[in-house]
């Protein structure tokens, strides 16, 4: 969901490091001061970053669509885009799959996606919650499930627990998500991202925008929620629920998660299935 882009205007609280034993390291203090300090130089730098980002906006989530398209599963019958927003990713997946389903809990988002993709018979859009969809479609026939900036809107443990039942053997889950900064590596990645963000904006959107970023006239506003779970918590949940999952910290305030459901392997010739042997 494009609105979940912290960029340089993110709330200072997301950058705070909790004190341990009543003291902070020099690095921790620096991280806090960069975001919260009333120093005129730092205040000016933050305002400059905000102005540059506003003049040269770009979509953090769509930036990772290429990663998704480069990691499609071998079998491509059915794909489900959870939290499809206005349907941009669902439209990009359509040429690669026999059918694509986009779901969104927000009525305005689902309506916008439906209007965008109304002429594509390969794509269907549903206005429903993920839990409802999973309960109705848990038949293990989906080859790809994508979630872009949506997992932090859902219950982490419950959502990950439902994935194996939805995916076909050999199916794949691809997540681009947001996590709460809670460690020095998190803060370092966020500081680098905040610095690189305007550079990427200049590259991808060199012509200054005439107006501040936001939805186009008549377009619904993306639902926004700050992430509550840390990358360490997400990794632990994925390890428990989806053995073999790969979680990686990325630039531009994102992480990626990839998991492949194990394929069904045929037993060797002459072997017996212990569950059915009498």
Give the location of each predicted region:
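Conserved class I S-adenosyl-L-methionine
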Residues: 77-85, 174-203
């Amino acid at each position: 969901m494009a609105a979940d882009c912290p960029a340089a205007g993110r709330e200072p609280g997301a950058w705070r490091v909790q004190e341990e034993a009543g003291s902070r390291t020099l690095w921790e203090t620096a991280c806090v001061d960069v975001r919260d300090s009333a120093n005129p130089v730092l205040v000016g730098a933050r305002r400059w970053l905000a102005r540059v980002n506003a003049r040269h906006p770009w979509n953090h989530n769509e930036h990772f669509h290429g990663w998704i398209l480069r990691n499609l599963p071998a079998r491509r019958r059915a794909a489900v885009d959870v939290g499809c927003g206005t349907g941009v990713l669902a439209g990009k997946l359509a040429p690669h799959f026999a059918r694509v389903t986009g779901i969104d809990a927000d009525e305005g988002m689902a309506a916008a996606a439906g209007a965008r993709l109304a002429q594509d018979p390969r794509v269907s859009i549903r206005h429903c919650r993920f839990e409802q969809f999973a309960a109705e479609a848990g038949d293990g026939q989906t080859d790809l499930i994508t979630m872009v900036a949506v997992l932090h809107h859902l219950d982490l443990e419950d959502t990950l627990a439902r994935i194996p039942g939805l995916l076909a053997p050999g199916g794949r889950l691809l997540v681009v998500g947001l996590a709460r900064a809670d460690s020095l590596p998190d803060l370092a990645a966020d500081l680098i991202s905040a610095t690189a963000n305007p550079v990427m904006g200049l590259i991808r959107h060199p012509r200054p925008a005439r107006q501040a970023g936001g939805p186009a006239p008549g377009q619904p506003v993306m639902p926004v929620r700050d992430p509550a779970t840390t990358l360490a918590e997400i990794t632990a949940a994925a390890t428990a629920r989806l053995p073999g999952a790969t979680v990686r910290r990325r630039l531009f305030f994102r992480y990626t998660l990839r998991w492949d459901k194990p394929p069904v392997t045929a037993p060797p010739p002459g072997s017996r299935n212990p569950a059915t042997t009498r």
